[in-house]
Amino acid sequence: MRYAGTAHKVGDHIDTDAIIPARFLVTTDAQKLGENCMEGLEHGWVARVKSGDIMVGGRNFGCGSSREHAPIAILGAGMPVVVAHSFARIFYRNGFNMGLLLLEVGDDVDKIADGDDIEVDAASGVITNRTTGATITCAPVPQSMRELLDTGGLVPYVRARLERENG
C-alpha cells in the first residue's frame, strides 16, 4: 500500500466537529461529507485538496465526539491517509473501520510542512518527504488492518469474509 500526495497540515487537537461540523451530519454520503471536510476549521479548506493528497495532523487528532462521519469526510475529500503525531483512540478505530489509513509518527510529524510532497508506504511504515528528503519511520500497519483497508473498511471486510465462508 503506497500513497503519494501533497501534505495538508493541521494543528493539534483537531476534533471531529472541526473535521465535519454537526450541521453536515444529515448524510453518510462520502462525496457530500467530503465537500465539507474541515469546514469547522476553515471555510473552503477542502478546495485546496486534490484526490490522493494526505492530511497531516498534530497531537490527539480526531478527539471529541465519536462519529464515523469524520473519517468518511476525509475519504470523501479524496485523502486516503492521515499522518499525525497521535490520534484519539476512538477516532483511530473508526478510521480503520471506515477504510482510512492512519499512521502515528510522534514528534517526527514536524518533518512535514504544509504543501510538502510526501509518500507513504504502509506495509513498511516508511514515510518519505520528497520535498525535503526526510524519512520518517513508524510502526508498519499490521496485515489484519491492511486487509480492512483493502476491502474498504470493517463492514465490507465482514461481508466478504461471510461470503467466502458461506459460499
Swiss-Prot record:
Keywords: Amino-acid biosynthesis, Branched-chain amino acid biosynthesis, Leucine biosynthesis, Lyase
Coiled-coil parts of chain: none
Stored CDD domains: IPMI_Swivel (cd01577)
Top class in the EC scheme: lyase
Catalytic activity: (2R,3S)-3-isopropylmalate = (2S)-2-isopropylmalate
Database matches in InterPro entries: Aconitase/3IPM_dehydase_swvl, AconitaseA/IPMdHydase_ssu_swvl, IPMI_Swivel, LeuD, LeuD_type2/HacB/DmdB
Enzyme Commission number: 4.2.1.33
Record keyword Metal-binding present: no
Pathway annotation from the record: Amino-acid biosynthesis; L-leucine biosynthesis; L-leucine from 3-methyl-2-oxobutanoate: step 2/4
Gene Ontology BP term (one): L-leucine biosynthetic process
Entries under SUPFAM superfamilies matching the protein: LeuD/IlvD-like (SSF52016)
GO molecular function: 3-isopropylmalate dehydratase activity
Role played: Catalyzes the isomerization between 2-isopropylmalate and 3-isopropylmalate, via the formation of 2-isopropylmaleate.
Assembly and interaction partners: Heterodimer of LeuC and LeuD.
Similarity comment: family membership: Belongs to the LeuD family. LeuD type 2 subfamily.
The name this protein goes by in its record: 3-isopropylmalate dehydratase small subunit
Species for this entry: Nitratidesulfovibrio vulgaris (strain ATCC 29579 / DSM 644 / CCUG 34227 / NCIMB 8303 / VKM B-1760 / Hildenborough)
Lineage of origin: Bacteria, Pseudomonadati, Thermodesulfobacteriota, Desulfovibrionia, Desulfovibrionales
